[in-house]
Amino acid sequence: MFKKKTVFVVGAGASKEVGLPVGDELKTAITGKLNIRFDDGYSQNSGDKKIVEALRLIVNERGERDINPLCQAGRIIASAMPQAISIDNFLHTHANDADIVLMGKLGIAASILEAERSSKICAKEGVINFAAHPHIWHNTFCKMLAENVQLGDLETIFDNVAFVTFNYDRCIEHFIAHWLENYFRISADHAQNLTKKLKVFHPYGQVGRLPWQGGGVSVGYGTELSSRTLPQIAGQIRTFTERVEDDAMLDEMRAYIANSEQIIYLGFSYGQMNMELLTIPTCSIYKSVFGTVFLMSAPNVTAVQNRVRMSLTTNTQNWVGRQEYLGAEANKLLNDYWYHLV
């Protein structure tokens, strides 16, 4: 169990450990789905068919029939992906183009739901095969969480832990609920109700709520993509511009960061837009910082250190105490610093 107030900041590299796409892979997947073209104007020969079905539903609800402007917006995104830092950056650039934003969200939603379905932690017949993938950070985190915990302690197991994930997937919530159920031999309902107590911020939204979470569009982890629910799921994804306008969520997220005693960055790229979202306005607690910098150059690691310090500086007062960065993946960082973190 974590004794210090801890915030985990999670990026795409962390979900990569369970088989979800990182930046370039996600851009490639989105390109394939949004490069929508037709032979003779009728027979679709490229792009995602379910997205096209969703477009027909969208324009029909608008009282229109022509999906070509939306398809064109999709092709614009597809052609620009090799130039983009990420799909998030591209949508931020074109935040005033409603068609591009809509198509980008549809591409993200379809790609992530498909990736969840093929991920290592997709529960086959309702059960995750924990033996097949013991060396993922999700498993190591749960072992740290459960260390010295007895059944009577379960209600407070998440008291000192929160997550900020910049990923659209639900890997964290999905895995933890299944892990608690199997390890502590409790019912699925009990495990899910416990996991509801874990604070998980999704600054850019998520591809639907898990059925047991309630609120919003309900989508099971690994569920087959439906063209009917895809527009609603896409509606739960937020661009950087939209998220900056969500004052209540940002205030709560930054309060958790400000009140933490340690911050652990896992598979995170430390991009400037995201660091801006993480920047705290006030603070009174010095923090230990641990982060992965897998495959980063020495100059970029120095820049990362500066960006983190800036995000944790208020009125010229810096609140970073110890800083440790490891050129490895998330699971190795948790294992190597286990005794320092719990």
Language model region names:
Residues K197-W212:
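Short, conserved secondary-structure transition motifs
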Residues H190-N193, V207-L210, H340-V342:
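Acidic, low-complexity terminal tails and accessory targeting/binding regions
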Residues F2, N45-L198, L250, R254, ...:
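Active-site periphery "cap/insert" segments of enzyme catalytic domains
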Residues F201, G214-D251:
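Flexible internal linker/loop segments at domain or repeat junctions
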